[in-house]
Amino acid sequence: MQNVINTVKGKALEVAEYLTPVLKESKFKETGVITPEEFVAAGDHLVHHCPTWQWATGEELKVKAYLPSGKQFLVTKNVPCYKRCKQMEYSDELEAIIEEDDGDGGWVDTYHNTGIAGITEAVKEITLESKDSIKLQDCSALCEEEEEEDEGEAADMEEYEESGLLETDEATLDTRKIVEACKAKTDAGGEDAILQTRTYDLYITYDKYYQTPRLWLFGYDEQRQPLTVEHMYEDISQDHVKKTVTIENHPHLPPPPMCSVHPCRHAEVMKKIIETVAEGGGELGVHMYLLIFLKFVQAVIPTIEYDYTRHFTM
């Protein structure tokens, strides 16, 4: 029944987005929403500091006129996912409601006190160095650490080969260390660890209706075969499956459908972060939007190791 409801909502929102005018005036500080121009600026900032993320165009027929043709959405590929959400230690005491006043019961940070980055942890890691400026440590160095760490095995987007959209780019993680790690685990008898290793391609698009970024993800198993919807749901916090996270068509790419983190609460969560920073005497620039965005959506997909921005300083 929930799938039917989500499908109906999805179709209605497609129409609503089509009819919604493009936001021209910045309302970031007041409401947490951003214009397409601000989305591009935040995307440029993310790509500069974390080059595993890259801009992409997608299908020519799906290009949005309100975004630059070469900057339709952001993508990072072959992101490792070593275990399922059910394998994480969990109890009700670790749960925190981020948004209380919505009809769906709030944005739930399931691993609020476990060290997994969520909305509260994101704010805690913000250090206000002055009232007039915000500084960001060189995140690119953190991104480069992936070349030294053992990650998950690589995966290709085989579904897109015939469309001509599959190409090698800088957004693809270096997976040589991933393979070496898997081999080492095999020699040590860790076969289960290999079978559990998955990889994901993640995308960030601009949602014209909600006027916020939107996260999309599509996964592959250790044999580089696309995961089923049920398998992808295993890597998503069960508090968000079929609620915050639904299966929908990517606005810039051909099928298959992907998991998408619904953006209906993004602006309100961002507004709370802006207020928290302001209470500490600082000011959150709109260029930081996607770095913060990647922090609070990790509460939804805590086992996917995409977040290389967790140690930035403000």
Curated annotation (Swiss-Prot):
The keyword Acyltransferase does not apply. The active site is at 264 (glycyl thioester intermediate). Residues 140-170 are annotated as: Interaction with ATG12. GO terms for biological process: autophagosome assembly; autophagy; autophagy of mitochondrion; glycophagy; mitochondrial fragmentation involved in apoptotic process; negative regulation of phagocytosis; nucleophagy; protein transport. A motif (Caspase cleavage motif LETD) lies at residues 166-169. Conjugated to ATG12 at Lys-243. ATG12-conjugation plays a role in regulation of mitochondrial homeostasis and cell death, while it is not involved in phosphatidylethanolamine-conjugation to ATG8-like proteins and autophagy. Cleaved by CASP8 upon death ligand binding such as tumor necrosis factor-alpha. CASP8 cleavage blocks survival-related autophagy and favors apoptosis. Coiled coil: none annotated. There is a cross-link at residue 243 (Glycyl lysine isopeptide (Lys-Gly) (interchain with G-Cter in ATG12)). InterPro entries: Atg3/Atg10. Its EC number is 2.3.2.-. PANTHER family: UBIQUITIN-LIKE-CONJUGATING ENZYME ATG3. Catalyzes the covalent conjugation of the C-terminal Gly of ATG8-like proteins (GABARAP, GABARAPL1, GABARAPL2 or MAP1LC3A) to the amino group of phosphatidylethanolamine (PE)-containing lipids in the membrane resulting in membrane-bound ATG8-like proteins which is one of the key steps in the development of autophagic isolation membranes during autophagosome formation. Cycles back and forth between binding to ATG7 for loading with the ATG8-like proteins and binding to E3 enzyme, composed of ATG12, ATG5 and ATG16L1 to promote ATG8-like proteins lipidation. This is Ubiquitin-like-conjugating enzyme ATG3. The gene is ATG3.
